């Protein structure tokens, strides 16, 4: 049987320093930005020639924080509340053979004159900071878009967005408006696990250099940001 060893061609840098809060799919939070920085072996600008002709990219990447020791044929999709099982190949679960992810992102700009080689600035990401990227391909609307496609069980169990409220104290933080809007849209997706909807519990989410604390009311369909703490350690965004 043919086997092939692959290596990262680039690293994705994002504001998501931990798994909690990462959008469940790419494109759900259009403002979520990322920077694709190529490994030294692949920093030749010729490898990107013509990429600006496209608006979106397919990113093939690895779930680097998941350690799958053995093959598990059944998984519990979060969309089903963590109670029903589906075949791993019928889901987008990160706990899968080879641990590969596939995301569609928008190209914001391509930066060629950088000390780190070419950098592709993208948005709509759903990846952890430091995620290894194994391949990049242009998104082709004429062949990759299928409006008639069925969403399977996902169509019957859609995520409802929630209303995000800021307490006055949280609004006094030094968070800029762009980051504030991004955080609102991240929390509007309700990052809590379907089986963990405790009321009055204070949750914490790290985004960029900020630690955002919030409470949720599932009955009212709201998330209230109660505090924002700035912390500069562990933030790896490329300058």
Q: Predicted regions span which residues?
A:
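Short, conserved beta-turn/loop elements at beta-strand boundaries and strand-helix junctions
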Residues: 17, 109-120, 219
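Enriched for short, Lys/Arg-rich terminal
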Residues: 217-239
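Residue-level recognition of beta-strand microenvironments
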Residues: 15, 110-113, 125, 136, ...
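Active-site-adjacent substructure of cysteine-protease-like catalytic cores
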Residues: 47-101, 195-199
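Arg/Lys-rich, positively charged N-terminal/basic patches that mediate binding to nucleic acids
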Residues: 1-45, 51-53, 141-185, 194, ...
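Basic/aromatic recognition patch in beta-strand/loop cores that engages polyanionic ligands
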Residues: 198-218
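Flexible glycine-rich active-site/ligand-binding loops centered on an Asp-His dyad
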Residues: 120-154
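Short coil-to-beta-strand transition motifs
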Residues: 2-8, 95-105, 208
